[in-house]
Amino acid sequence: AAAAGLKRCFLPLENLREGSVIGGIDCYGVSTLAELAVLLRGRTPLPEPAVFSEESLPLEETPDFSDLAGQELVKRATLLAAGGRHNILYIGPAGTGKSMIASRLPYILPAMSREERLSVSEIYSISGLLPPDRPLMTKRPYRSPHHTVTGLALSGGGQKPRPGEICLAHEGVLFLDELPEYHAATLEVLRQPLEEH
C-alpha cells in the first residue's frame, strides 16, 4: 500500500504492530469490519496511527565469536567466507566446534539493510514464524535443518505452499550439519539455488 502511494491502511488489530514497521503510511488497527465501516464513514475520529520504533524491540542474545577458544584457522576461514558472502564447508570429527562456529556466522555478517530486514520479516510473517514481540527481524536468520529434512521442506511448496529452509535462511545462514547423512535427492534440491547465488 505504501509503495502504491496510499496514505493510510487499516489492518486487523493483531497485525497492527507488524504493519507499522513499513513506514511511510499511517496504519490503523480494527477488530471487526463493522468498526472499519464506522471509521471510514467518519462517524468517529481516527485514532493516532501506530508508530513503530526499533528501540522498542526486546534485546536479542548475540553469541560472540570471540567466545570460541582455539580453532584459529577455522575462525579465520569463517571470517573470510562471511566477509565475501561465500559458502563454506567444515570438515572434521564430531565435537570440534563446527556447529558452534557456524551458529555464530549471522553475528559476524554485516548488519542487514532496512530492505533486507523487511524482506526477511515478510518471509517469517507468511511462514507464521515471526515472533509477536518482534515485528521486524533485525538479525540474520540461522537455519539448521536435521538431516532427515525432506526436499519439499528444504525447498518449500506443497499443497499449502510454505517457504522452505532455503527461503527461511534468506539473507542469513543455512547450515547443513552431517552433510553425508542427507539423502542425495534432498541435496539435489540445493543445486539451483547454489548455482544462482
Predicted regions and their residues:
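Conserved RecA-like P-loop NTPase ATPase core
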Residues: 1, 32, 78, 117, ...
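Peripheral, non-AAA+ core regions of ATP-driven protein-machinery
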Residues: 1-89, 93-99, 183
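Signal for well-folded cores of large energy- and translation-related assemblies
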Residues: 2, 41, 69, 79-83, ...
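Loop/turn-to-beta-strand initiation segments
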Residues: 7, 86-87, 170-173, 196-197
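Beta-to-alpha transition at the N-cap of a short helix in the ABC ATPase nucleotide-binding domain
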Residues: 74, 101, 114, 186-187
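Conserved alpha-helical scaffold flanking the Walker A/P-loop in AAA+ ATPase domains
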Residues: 79, 135-136, 140-141, 151-174
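Walker A/P-loop
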Residues: 83, 89-134
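Conserved AAA+/SF3 P-loop NTPase catalytic/coupling segment centered on the Walker-B
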Residues: 146-150, 162-195
